[in-house]
Amino acid sequence: MEKLLLGVVGVGHLGSLHTKMLLDISNVHLVGIHDIDGAKAQKIAAEFGIRSYDTLDDLLGQVDAVTIATNTMAHFEVARTALQRGKHLFIEKPVTETIVEAEELCRLAREKKLIVQVGHIERFNPAILALDRYEIRPMFVESHRLAQFNPRGTDVAVVLDLMIHDIDLILSFVKSPVARVEANGVAVVSDSVDIANARIQFENGCVANVTASRISQRKMRKMRLFQRNEYISLDFSEGLAEVFRLVEGDEPSAKGTMKLGELGSGKHKRIVVYEQPEVKDVNALKYELELFVKAVRHKTKPLVTAEDGRRALEVANAILEKINQQKLQL
């Protein structure tokens, strides 16, 4: 099978990482890159020994698919142009600035039967991949995503920059529509919200309490899932998953299970166990790009679809709307 011809649009910090990873994927031929900053594109092209294209149209004329790592404001125009030219897309999160734009990309992708994968990278975190043998059905979720201040990314609110990772994960876990959103947030050092907290209620009764900050003294990327007979703790920075379960007395134990205690007796006896699922040693960015390539080559549904990106953006925008309403009341 011939190699997939790929291009990268936008070669800032993340686009440079795309370039590096794609060069290391065996069934991909990285045709070249494009950036509105021509000097930057030429510098990156020289660094990796590839070609820099002066215009987006020139690059699109040579490829089967592109990855889009521009700033968020440019996502829609670049993506729409690529889809209209019949190109498959890997587009970084958030998928677009507005729901209307996201819906248009979803429509175009369906109409032209093209693959669109959104770069919600935490779906490919080793901690998440380690849960593949567990049934995830949380009724309460607590997440904290805290980062030290970095001017890169402040073109959007922290809800769209950081919190959207957790929003996407929670939506993938909770198979129920969102019923209500409450939120508060503050712009501390930038012109947009730098710290935010949201409470997301679902129709099935699940509640998610989500906090994100880009002005923290220390870093943290953790999530806790509480469900019937099970508590799951995830550390995305460490790629670690820990599971505390209540099991029947005669249920076989998985490898690496530690008994913590017992409840009841006889046929009613249940055991509290601790498990640390084996994690896969993967580079999350490379892995999600590999799966995008696989989806394009085999014409299969990607793990994170354009519709997934739209849903995450819809909830993120609802959170921002609530924060703005709070401001107006002050």
Each model region followed by its residue ranges:
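A contiguous active-site-proximal alpha/beta segment in oxidoreductase catalytic domains
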Residues: 96-153
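Beta-loop-alpha module in the N-terminal Rossmann-like domain of NAD(P)-dependent dehydrogenases
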Residues: 18, 48-106
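Mid-domain beta-loop-alpha active-site segment that forms a flexible
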Residues: 119-126, 149-180, 193-194, 309
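Contiguous beta-strand/loop segments that form the cofactor/metal-binding neighborhood of enzyme cores
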Residues: 167-244, 279-299
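A short helix->loop->beta-strand "cap" motif at the edges of active sites that frequently abuts
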Residues: 50, 85-87, 112-115, 206
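C-terminal helix-rich "cap/oligomerization" subdomain common to oxidoreductases
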Residues: 65-67, 287-330
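N-terminal Rossmann-like dinucleotide-binding module
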Residues: 1-48, 170
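Hydrophobic residues in well-ordered beta-strands that form the structural core
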Residues: 54, 91, 116-118, 142, ...
